[in-house]
C-alpha cells in the first residue's frame, strides 16, 4: 500500500479523507478558516489508506468518510458528527428519458452502469435498490459494473450506457451535458451518512473539537447542501 503524504512537521490539525470527498472537504475547510485561526492540514487518498494511516500514524486527528465504512474499519471517535446524507440517483444521457427509476428494467435500457457493490458505497446502495425494487434479475444481463462513481458518470456523459446508478453530488451540476437524473427513494437503500470523526487518540483534541463544532453551523450546512447532501 502506498503511504499518504502526511505532514512532516508539527501541525495544528490534520484531517484525512477519501479522495472522493476532496471538493467537499476543501470547501468545508475554506469556510472553517474564515471563522478560526486554526489552519488544518489536509490529507487525501483511498479510504483504505486513510483508515490505515488513522490507525497507525499517530498524526491524523480527524477522519471524514462514510460512517458505515469507518465503523467497519474499527476506528474509535469522540465525537463523530454527521455532515450530510449521500443520495443515490439514476442518471441518463442525452437522447434518453426515464420517468421512473424502475425504467432501468425496461428493454430500451440496454446498458446500465453502476459502481462495484462490494467495494463502493453507492454500488452497495444501487444493489440494495435493485433488490428492494424486485428488478435485480431483470437488469443482471445489462449491468456494467465499474470501480467508482465518477466512472459511471463518465459512461453516462459519453452515451455509452443508457442509464447509470450514481450519486447526486456527481451529476447535480452537469446541466445539459446529460439527459437528466432522478433521485431514488431513500427507503430503497440503507442511509449513506457522510461525517467527520475526531479520533479518540487524537493529539490535537481541542482543535479537533472546534472543527467538529463548526460542522453544526449554518455555514457548514450550506457547504454540504452545495455538494448535494
Question: Language-model features: where?
Answer:
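Bacterial N-terminal signal peptides
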Residues: 1-7
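Exported/periplasmic ABC-transporter solute-binding proteins
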Residues: 11-44, 48-229
